[in-house]
């Protein structure tokens, strides 16, 4: 979570600090809790030194995330802080956390963060509070106060909560419940609110965004949602977490026809081999991987493709892994993230036989990343000499250099564009979007300079 205080008005009650861990969906929950407490008159800060009580919104997706959450909790407890533990770790281990951390004054589940003010008031009255619904059912909307903690120009917009799928390796349905979609009108209303705050990029998030609306309307409605959001005056709309089978012709047509939807597809494919996918409880996917990617590239020639993969899944053989290597070599993704399998208690995969040695899994991860790096470099180099819009996010007043992102880079997970002033010294402030001619590229990042009017006139005359 970004440093510094995030108060919107003079508080009338004590200051509460926040520590945020985990994914963008967790971040939105944090922002709602911040907004609710600020509305109730509490001061809110991201610096734990400002407060005696710290709300820690935790992650429990994989073992590394759990350990980071626990380290954060223990560190704050050793500083003498009183803790309100929220989020996925709280949903997962509520009783154990209350027993093992005396400084934990309250536990708040993933479907209960809207009660944060009541919880804090009960803590202040001397209670120890367990506010965890056994089955999360809540999903926030545009009426729930929210105070953003991200860069001024970027906002995550949660379109649904929970997940109806049961992938063998994933614990998310146990932590966040079944899918609950928001109405299209609610999402569009919040989008307008965010635009009024100066947001230039909306990132649509849920567990499976291509399944948006299935529970609410009886069929997926992502295409209709994108077309409705196309009426919102915002430069970029980005979609995260697209399940392969949900990329229907209607959805791809919306990508192609709605001008402010960027052609960036985040596809968590996980693997390529049919036997591994069957063990992951994703048996249908092997039939669509290559065909789907061909369709995307046919309909969206400038599409930027990101995927995430899992290696070391129980039973993964060297043959399975080589199949995945060949798939990656053939498909030439722009961006790839690779994870080694982490067995999660309560998931089907945790009970599977034939575990892969951790050293073998790590070696496979390293091999995939080594294969992908020159592909990513080549994909980036294909953008050299193009002029693209760049959203400026940082500016160094000493050097004049700026850092931003073009549409091919999502925040935090992808690269950056390092921007030099234009030939006449043109600069841009954070939160603004400017044309930049790309002059260089490496594995992860691009570099370029701002294009001024003189450059644009010269380019047009050269093309005439």
Swiss-Prot record:
Residues of the MTTase N-terminal domain: 14-125
Keyword Magnesium included in the entry's annotation: no
Localization per record: Cytoplasm
Residue intervals of the TRAM domain: 381-452
Cofactor: [4Fe-4S] cluster
EC number: 2.8.4.4
InterPro entries: Elp3/MiaA/NifB-like_rSAM, Methylthiotransferase, Methylthiotransferase_CS, Methylthiotransferase_N, Methylthiotransferase_N_sf, NA-bd_OB-fold, Ribosomal_uS12_MeSTrfase_RimO, rSAM
GO MF terms held by the record: 4 iron, 4 sulfur cluster binding; aspartic acid methylthiotransferase activity; metal ion binding; protein methylthiotransferase activity
Binding residues for [4Fe-4S] cluster 2: 163, 167, 170
Family annotation (SMART domains): Elp3
Signal peptide location: none
Chain positions recorded as [4Fe-4S] cluster 1 binding sites: 23, 59, 88
Radical SAM core domain sequence ranges: 149-378
Enzyme class, spelled out: transferase
Highest taxon, organism lineage: Bacteria
Family from the record: Belongs to the methylthiotransferase family. RimO subfamily.
PANTHER family the UniProt entry points to: RIBOSOMAL PROTEIN S12 METHYLTHIOTRANSFERASE RIMO, RIBOSOMAL PROTEIN US12 METHYLTHIOTRANSFERASE RIMO
Xref: NCBIfam families: 30S ribosomal protein S12 methylthiotransferase RimO (TIGR01125), MiaB/RimO family radical SAM methylthiotransferase (TIGR00089)
Protein known as: Ribosomal protein uS12 methylthiotransferase RimO
Species: Parasynechococcus marenigrum (strain WH8102)
Name of the gene this protein is made from: rimO
